[in-house]
UniProtKB/Swiss-Prot annotation:
Subunit description: Component of the heterotrimeric velvet complex composed of LAE1, VEL1 and VEL2; VEL1 acting as a bridging protein between LAE1 and VEL2. Forms a heterodimeric complex with VOS1; the formation of the VEL2-VOS1 complex is light-dependent.
One protein family per Pfam: Velvet
One CC-aspect GO term: cytoplasm
Comp. bias regions, Polar residues: 18-28, 40-62, 205-217
Taxonomic source organism: Botryotinia fuckeliana (strain B05.10)
Protein name according to UniProt: Velvet complex subunit 2
Record GO biological process: sporulation resulting in formation of a cellular spore
Amino acid composition bias (Low complexity), ranges on this chain: 267-283
Effects seen without this gene: Leads to light-independent conidiation, loss of sclerotial development and oxalic acid production, and reduced virulence on several host plants. Increases conidiation and melanin biosynthesis.
Keywords: Cytoplasm, Nucleus, Sporulation, Transcription, Transcription regulation
Amino acid sequence: MNTTAYASPPRDMHPRSTMPSLHDTTYRSGPPHQGAPYSMPQTMASQHSTISAYEQYNNSLPVSRPPPPEHLPSSEAVSSFSIGLPGQEPSPRSITVDGRKYTLEVQQQPKRARMCGFGDKDRRPITPPPCVKLSITEIATGKEVDVNNIEHGMFVLNVDLWSADGERPVNLVRHSQTSPSISATVPVSYTQIQGGAAAYSSLLPGQSQREPTSPTYGSAPPFQGAGFSPFPGPPQVSAYSQQQPGQQSGYGGNPNYPPPNGYQVAPQQSNYYYPQPSQSIPSHNNQDPYPSRPFTPQDLGIGRIPISQTNPPQGMFTRNLIGSLSASAFRLTDPDDRIGIWFVLQDLSVRTEGDFRLRFSFVNVGVPSAPQNNANSSCSVNTGKAPVLASCFSEVFKVYSAKKFPGVVESTPLSKCFATQGIKIPIRKDGKDGPGKGGKDGSRGDDDDDY
């Protein structure tokens, strides 16, 4: 068999899109060597020749990314090449349904808020309240649909909390606690470290503190002979409080401790571990197994897990954005005397401080029984799925702590205009009641006094 050593890789080893032209002088190498086909110097020389050719080719490539193709529209080019770039504003989205395009626009942006923490008693809304306007455009004519010809009774706007860059939602926050919480989902119990000794929790109820010479399942009262805190919670009933001949108490229990009812009972289950009913109990000292507590002998090899090696509970998840997270549509008049379909979200609060955005999503939950050509067309509730017809993001607003909060924003003309039309928007007073209205020093009191 004749074998040829190539000074450059064959043509079929590289895709055509990434392989330079073979007619390029920088890529072509000299003629094949005439020595032994598997000679080590020739192999090393061919590799060096190939690397040098590719280094020259890569150095000739431009460093910057090529511009987007010219045949793409400008909007598609930006969306396909600018997604996830830092500092880019998230763009609104809208879809066309039945020849109509729905568009959302935040006319009044949120600016700042005071964090409300994890209690619901002292909750401060975002100021100024976000006001979103809905516009519906006919695709055929390009004109906006008259508000009086739109049935808005089933229009709903949902809001959720997003990060300042608009890349991820931050609707949930973990409520951290200093003391661990007991949960049925945690298979082990968590105890406090006392006297510098390592605290352990047993996966199998009744397992001894030290490895016994024989399998034992007895336990004494929690405060006898234990080098660490036992399971927290209510007192446990000692099932094997009276020792059997030839057995050792795993917790150093008192052998004279009488059984609670005069006879031996099956071991009690722990509040933190529930074994599967398909397991069986091993017999020890030729005793019959207890059918009420079965498990296999292989389970005896399960050791105790130190708390430092487990994931302690970090608290429960709760919503970061609280309040009225949805709003119905209203036909309102703005300060310029123009009628439109508006969504006002005046009851939104954030638990934690930081920079955030609000994302608004518009959904029509109604199913019209007739074409929406007049305001009297009846609608029924959609019991299936409803698509998000439009969505948009607000500008970045800041949530302050209680000490750093500069105060609520002055009421805007738009808020005052909507308040006169029956929308429940908190309006700041003009301070006509005098300085005594506020604190003891004559200054304005807390923000609650201004509403």
